[in-house]
Amino acid sequence: MAEKCSAVFMDRDGTINEEVSFLNRMEQLKLYPQSGEAIRLINAAGMKAVVVSNQSGIARGYFTEDFVRSVHDRINELLGAEGARIDGFYVCPHHPIHGQGIYKQDCDCRKPKPGMLLQAAREMNIDLARSYMVGDMLRDVQTGKNAGAKGILVKTGYGVNVIRTDMPAYIAGDILEAVQWILKDRKKE
């Protein structure tokens, strides 16, 4: 079996693109200016770039899974213009309280549970102990910890207002600073 690779798991909204409450129109999608460079660095380092995102708007009926896939296609199109790519997108469409139909469930994939990272690790041959989870909420950091990866908080999106700082391995101003720290941290291995 091939050697396992490491990955940078990233939250989507508020981490690589601007936070809007329930992105449900394509024109709302705006990548942060530093996202392309950050993800290009991940790609160049031979790490997998993986988005893991709670999308309870699906459960709530605000948009469809097909719409979310089209957003992810557009993200890779925008990143591709900058020489970068996301290797995998994993989405939790559920909500335990506000979900409708099959989407109303207490699942294993909704962050801070590690289900999306565990699934990606299986499907993409990722070594979670050598991987990182970057996000703008403490639940993103906790998701990384729950999967055995290092959690990094970015001070964009909801992260701007986070005061508690005892959980992350690092607190970065944005995704680019987070990736620069990751690349330095990997050299310690």
Feature map (PLM): residue ranges:
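Active-site flanking residues adjacent to catalytic metal/cofactor-binding acidic residues
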Residues: 10-12, 53, 135-136, 173
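A short, flexible beta-alpha/helix-coil linker loop
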Residues: 21-23, 56-59, 96-97, 160
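A short secondary-structure junction motif
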Residues: 55-68
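Catalytic P-loop NTPase motifs of RecA-like helicase/translocase cores
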Residues: 16-17, 59, 140-141
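Active-site neighborhood of HAD-like aspartate-dependent phosphohydrolases
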Residues: 2-50
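Asp-based, Mg2+/Mn2+-dependent phosphohydrolase catalytic module
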Residues: 2-4, 66-69, 73-88, 96-133, ...
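Short beta-strand segments at enzyme active-site cores
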Residues: 48-54, 87-92, 153-154
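Short glycine-enriched, charge-decorated loop/helix-capping segments at active-site entrances
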Residues: 21-30, 64-66, 103-107
